Amino acid sequence: MYNFGVSTFIWTENFSVKDLWIIPKAKDLGFETLDIFIVHPETFPTAEVKAKVAEVGIEPVTITTLTKETNVISPDPNIRAAGVKSLKKLVDVNVELGSKIIGGVTYAGWGCLSGKPRTEQEWEWSVTAMREVAQYAKNKSDLVITVETVNRFESHFLNIAEDAVRYCKQVGTGNVKVHLDSFHMIREETSFTGAVNTCGKEYLGYIHLCENNRGIPGTGLVPWKEFFTALKGVGYTGPMVIESFDPGFEELNRLCAIWRKFADSGEALAVEGLRNLKAIAAEV
C-alpha cells in the first residue's frame, strides 16, 4: 500500500498558524501524510500544529532549506554555527510534533551556488555539521534526517543519489538518509531505477513526486511506472509526497522559476496528480 502525501506548498508559501485549515483539507482530499515546510523553526506554531494533526489523524513530515544565513558550508564559522543551531531547533520541533522525517536541503544553503564544483573543505564542513545534528536527533528520538538531491541550478553540493549515499555513510550516525525528488532526478540521474537501487532500502528515506515541469504528476516525462517499480523493488514503504506550487505564489515561484499555470490551483494539481499516480501505482 502506498502512503501518498501532499506538500503545504500546494496552498501556502510560508506555513503559519493561519494555515491550520490545510491540515484537515489534506486529509479530506485523500492524503495520508502532510509535508510541512519550515524555514524558521524558532517561530513555527508547533503546539497548534501538533494538536491539529492529532485531531485530524494525518502523518506530519517536515522539510526545510538552509539559507545563506544558515549555510553550513559557508567559510564563515558563525554562519555554519547558525545552521547547526537552526537544524537542532528543527529537530526539537519534529520531536514535539511526532514527525519521523525531516526532508529538504539540510546540508547546504539552498541556492547558494559557489560557481564551481563542491570542494573537499565544503564536504568536510557539511558532514561535520550534519553529524552533530544527527547525533543530537538520535539522542532524542528515532527521527530520520534526509538530504535531498537537487538539480545543478539550485545547489552544487548534492545532485545525485550516489553522492548522497556516500554523504550519509560518511556522517555515519545511521539516521541520515536520502531524499529523492523526481523533478530533480529527471535532470541529474541517468536512470530512475539506478538511483533508487543506489540508495536501496538502507539509505532511501523520503520521496517527493513532482512532474518534470512542476505540472500535474502523470502528465509529463517522469517515468512513473519505472519509478514505482524500483521503489517497490527495494521495499520502500515511506511517504510519497506530491510537491508543486500554487500558480498565485510570487516569491516562491520566482525562486523556483515557475512562469506559467499548470492547473487552476495548486489543490487542483494535487487532486488530479493523486488520481493519476494511484492509477499508475495500481499497475505495479
What spans do the regions from the language model cover?
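A short, flexible beta-alpha/helix-coil linker loop
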Residues: 11, 68-70, 109-111, 151-152, ...
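Short beta-strands and strand-loop turn motifs
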Residues: 5-8, 34-35, 64, 104-105, ...
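Histidine-acidic metal/acid-base catalytic patches
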Residues: 1-12, 16-27, 47, 98-100, ...
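Structural motif corresponding to the early beta-alpha repeats
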Residues: 32, 36-127, 237, 241-251, ...
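Active-site acidic/histidine proton-transfer and metal-coordination neighborhood
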Residues: 55, 78-177, 187, 260, ...
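Residues at the starts of beta-strands that form the adenosine-phosphate
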Residues: 3, 59, 143-144
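Short N-terminal micro-motifs specific to bacterial/archaeal maturation
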Residues: 13, 40, 71-74, 117, ...
